[in-house]
Amino acid sequence: MAETIQIGPIVLRFLHSRHDTNGSLDMFEMDVAEDGRMPVPHYHRNWDETIYGLRGTLMFDVGGKPITLNPEDTFFIPRGTVHGFENRSGKLATCLCVLTPGVLGAEYFRELSAVVAAGKPDPKVLREIMLRHGLVPVAA
């Protein structure tokens, strides 16, 4: 059964994780509400990410290059590449995210969700959570 995790305006539905793929991949659908965005651009130390558009439109910045993700579009983010996204379309947007190898799991997102749900999160706490899970935040 898929696990659903909400982090503010972003909802993740985990379809597979490192736990059920023997570490091969993590896979989740990500809904981004209108005006939703990744609060901190970052890069991954230990995994690559492939994004596939399902519905709506998201704007990504990948390595300083703007990318518009529409339904059926796809792109690849190599580990070490700074990226971020936002939904400027005025409508819900959804994409499929595949992380390879599967080293993150849902644990990071669960922890982040709890901190965000408790109120305005301390940026130092968010940074510590990100670093502990292999994401390196980069100043915007």
Model-predicted segments: where are they?
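A short glycine-rich, His/Asp/Glu-containing loop-to-beta-strand
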Residues: 5-41, 48
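Histidine-centered active-site/metal-ligand motif
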Residues: 42-44, 83, 133
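Asparagine-centered strand-capping/turn motif at beta-strand->loop junctions
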Residues: 86-89
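Short acidic-glycine-tyrosine-enriched beta hairpin
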Residues: 64-82
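Double-stranded beta-helix
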Residues: 91-140
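Short beta-strand segments
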Residues: 39-41, 62-67
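Short, conserved beta-strand element in jelly-roll/cupin
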Residues: 29-33, 43-61, 98-99
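Structural motif
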Residues: 11, 50, 57-59, 66, ...
